[in-house]
Every structure is written in structure tokens, then in C-alpha cells.
Amino acid sequence: MSSTVKAANWRFVEVGRVVLVDNKELATIVEIIDQKRVLIDGPKIQRQAIALAKIVLTPIVLPNLPRGSRTATVTKKWAAADIDAKWAASGWAKKLANKERRSQLSDFERFQVMVLKKQRRFATKKALVKA
């Protein structure tokens, strides 16, 4: 009997880590202030100190970002690393966009979604009966 020990895939709080603020805006960690706060900056968000409890770490890291980088440096490196495209391609971003789209549906559009789901369910049941 053998067992394999696999290391956990942690998201470390590190300079250059891209974070999600309020499930909306992306920013990157520029400086670690203390155990509970970091300094963040990004193209769509103002440079600010924020508690780690109010952000979510993403798997994306901005490579070779110096500690305490200024806004211009962060913006240049952000564009060079194409962070927005990486985020848009991630499943997490797609899920958030889908959630936002669903919340914007009108009553009739929700009805149409329900009808389409019923049709899809019926088609799968019909295929299972034939098999």
C-alpha cells in the first residue's frame, strides 16, 4: 500500500498577486502593510489600503512587480502581462458575468429560460428512453 502526499495549491498574499475587490474590480497587491491589511492598486481602482477580509485572492500573479510600485508602473506591467484578458478567460470571471447577466433578466426572459430548460430536459429524457 502506497500513498502519495500532494502539496496544497495555496494562493499566497504576495506583492503582485491580483485580487478581486467587492466581486467587481481587479487590483494588485503593491505592498503588505501588516498581517491584516495590504496596499492595492490597479487600472480601475484607486490606490488604497484595504483589509484582507474585504478582498479575494485570484490565481493570477503580476510577475516581477517591485514592492511599493507607483501607479504608472503597475499600469504598464498590468498591460504588458495582459491581466484583463487572463481574467476574462478564467472560469471565475465567466461565472460572475453570467450571474450579472441573469440578475438583469426581465420577467419574460426568465420565462424563456425556463421553457428552454424544460425543452432540454425533455430531449435528454427522450434520448435516454430510446437508448
UniProtKB/Swiss-Prot annotation:
Which named protein is this? Large ribosomal subunit protein eL14
Alphabetically sorted, this entry's keywords are: Cytoplasm, Ribonucleoprotein, Ribosomal protein
Q: What is its main location?
A: cytoplasm
- Could you tell me which species this protein originates from? Candida albicans (strain SC5314 / ATCC MYA-2876)
Compartmental location: Cytoplasm
Which terms does the UniProt entry file under GO BP? ribosomal large subunit biogenesis; translation
Which Gene3D superfamilies does this UniProt record tie to the protein?
2.30.30.30, 6.10.250.2270
Function, as annotated: Component of the ribosome, a large ribonucleoprotein complex responsible for the synthesis of proteins in the cell. The small ribosomal subunit (SSU) binds messenger RNAs (mRNAs) and translates the encoded message by selecting cognate aminoacyl-transfer RNA (tRNA) molecules. The large subunit (LSU) contains the ribosomal catalytic site termed the peptidyl transferase center (PTC), which catalyzes the formation of peptide bonds, thereby polymerizing the amino acids delivered by tRNAs into a polypeptide chain.
* Superkingdom field: Eukaryota
What family is this?
A: Belongs to the eukaryotic ribosomal protein eL14 family.
Q: Which GO terms describe its molecular function?
A: RNA binding; structural constituent of ribosome
Please indicate if the UniProt record lists Iron-sulfur as a keyword.
no
Kindly list the cysteine pairs connected by disulfide bridges.
Answer: none
**Chain coiled-coil ranges:** none
Q: Which GO terms describe its cellular component?
A: cell surface; cytosolic large ribosomal subunit; hyphal cell wall; preribosome
**Quaternary context:** Component of the large ribosomal subunit. Mature ribosomes consist of a small (40S) and a large (60S) subunit. The 40S subunit contains about 32 different proteins and 1 molecule of RNA (18S). The 60S subunit contains 45 different proteins and 3 molecules of RNA (25S, 5.8S and 5S).
